[in-house]
Amino acid sequence: LHVAIETSYIHGRKKRSMAQESALVFPKNFYNNFYELTKAMASMETDQHMVVDGLRVVQLLPAIVIGDSRTGNNRGDTKVVNAPVNAFGRAKEALDALRSTPFGESKAAAIASVAMVFPADRSAELNLITVDRVVEGILASLTRPEAIGERVHLATDNRIRTEDIIKVEKEELGVNVRLTDPTLFRNVTLPLITTILKKANEPRLASALEKLGTIFGGYGEWGQPIHSVGNDVRVLGLPLRRPNTLYAFRMLCRHNKLVQEFGKVKDPDEIARRERVWAAALARIEKESGRQAASLEAEEFRRRIGEVLDLKSFEPK
């Protein structure tokens, strides 16, 4: 048995039609990037080997994979959704530090006016799937003979809009971001912004925004596919209730801010220690509140995490 791990974004951009699990048609509006294109080519080649050579294969197509649904653990600056979270988190920290310097308030306001922009179309929807759901799908595919020959979207039926991302980031990170046209941002605004920031002696912030444009830019544009789902439940036998995307993104913001400090904590041993402390703190909060940590409003979560965790030393209280 061969398990092919692809991406649900092999369907490319679509204006109206839904991306079906059973069909793979070269899109009229092309792809967000060459990663998606090469994955689509690989899927077509897999289909060919299945038909011609009798390859026993299950094709699993995860959407945009993010962290664990409970803890938000989503390491790495090069991940699609980490890009806006870490970029704006670092931007806010840099601007807060700048405000404490002479004439810093006016300088910070000027930088914020050009830096705190989010390259996304209001109509764009992202299909995020938690890593634990993907792992469940992979393990299930190994014990389901009926999955052979099937293409399975490991995706969600509750997508997140760019407006939701901005709202959650404001609540969790305290950043005020405005939407801007992604194509204009990538080709005109971003080069201008990075030049201004470098001249203003903010090279790290410029680098973070460059990563945002490079990694996330395409996924904020029009025509993002709406994925059909069903084979994950019907064929693989996964639970019908798929992860709550908004909850997962909220926990990702909290994790990136508190556990990894927007990517500044890089030592693997220290990260592993913090992950253990974080998981235990969440378990304590959930036991005391009787609710999922992800369901708590931002202000209540900040209060509760401060009661169980020393955020400076990152040790339990």
Task: Kindly give the residue locations of the regions a language model identified.
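Conserved Rossmann-fold NAD(P)-dependent oxidoreductase catalytic core, especially the SDR/UDP-sugar
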Residues: 1-37, 51-52, 57-58, 69-71
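Flexible loop/turn segments at secondary-structure boundaries
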Residues: 8-14, 66-71, 135, 158-163, ...
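Conserved catalytic Lys-bearing alpha helix of Rossmann-like short-chain dehydrogenase/reductases
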Residues: 38-46, 84
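NAD(P)-dependent short-chain dehydrogenase/reductase
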Residues: 50-125, 131-136
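Hydrophobic "lid"/C-terminal helical patch
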Residues: 88, 138-142, 169, 251-256
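Substrate-binding strand-loop-helix patch
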Residues: 120-136, 151-172, 183-191
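Terminal hydrophobic/aromatic helix or amphipathic segment near a protein terminus
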Residues: 162-223, 242-245, 260-273
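Amphipathic terminal alpha-helices
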Residues: 223-317
